[in-house]
Amino acid sequence: MNIFKKKTTPKDALRTSKREMAVATRGIEREITSLQLEEKRLVAEIKKTAKTGNEAATKILARQLVRLRQQITNLQGSRAQIRGVTTHTQALYASTSISSGMKGATKAMVAMNKQMAPTKQAKVIKDFQKQSAQLDMTIEMMSEAIDETLDKDEAEEETEDLTNQVLDEIGVGVASQLSSAPKGRIATKTAAPPASTAATNKNSESSEVDELEKRLASLRRI
């Protein structure tokens, strides 16, 4: 016994068997083809002999035809048996492959069952619930912070938009006048201007002050 000889695997055995069966099948098919050609020749000869009226020769040829057709039938049966053996061998190999696969799957399931024992599963579920709760709290805190920031930004944006809208309505000139207007009550007494200047601008100043007071009052209502 050669200890260094490579062990034959089921796949190698199947390949060898299929090759041998294919060779045998081709040999039988060649023989069947040859006999079928001989059958055609013999049939033609029987017809020719029958036309001459030679009854004895015709019967001898007919017996040869019967034996020939029987040989063809036997060879066809052998070919069918070889094909059946090939199919059976392939089925056995498939069963072997399935068995090997089932063994591997069984080992995998055993390993998973060991890793996922009830106590380990309970611990995994508990850890998952804990981490999930922490994640929910973190997300909630982040959402509150984001909402608060957005609310402040929206309030500031709304205030700024409203202010700009009011300033657009009253005009940039009025805004400039408001920024340069005297602080406190507008009617407060100040140092007396020169007599000539007071006499000239008295009417115009009075009308401007009245207009500013009206617009300031409207801004306060807004």
Swiss-Prot record:
Main localization (coarse): other
Keyword Coiled coil tagged: yes
High-level lineage: Eukaryota, Viridiplantae, Streptophyta, Embryophyta, Tracheophyta
Location of the protein in the cell: Endosome
Gene of this entry: VPS2.2
Keywords: Coiled coil, Endosome, Protein transport, Transport
Full protein name: Vacuolar protein sorting-associated protein 2 homolog 2
One annotated Gene Ontology cellular component of this protein: ESCRT III complex
Residue ranges of coiled coil: 26-83, 143-222
Function: Component of the ESCRT-III complex, which is required for multivesicular bodies (MVBs) formation and sorting of endosomal cargo proteins into MVBs. The ESCRT-III complex is probably involved in the concentration of MVB cargo.
One of the GO BP terms on file: vacuolar transport
Spans through the membrane: none
Sequence similarity: Belongs to the SNF7 family.
Bias-annotated ranges (Low complexity): 187-203
Disordered, as annotated region: 179-222
SUBUNIT field: Component of the endosomal sorting required for transport complex III (ESCRT-III), composed at least of VPS2, VPS20, VPS24 and VPS32. Interacts with CHMP1A, CHMP1B and VPS60-1.
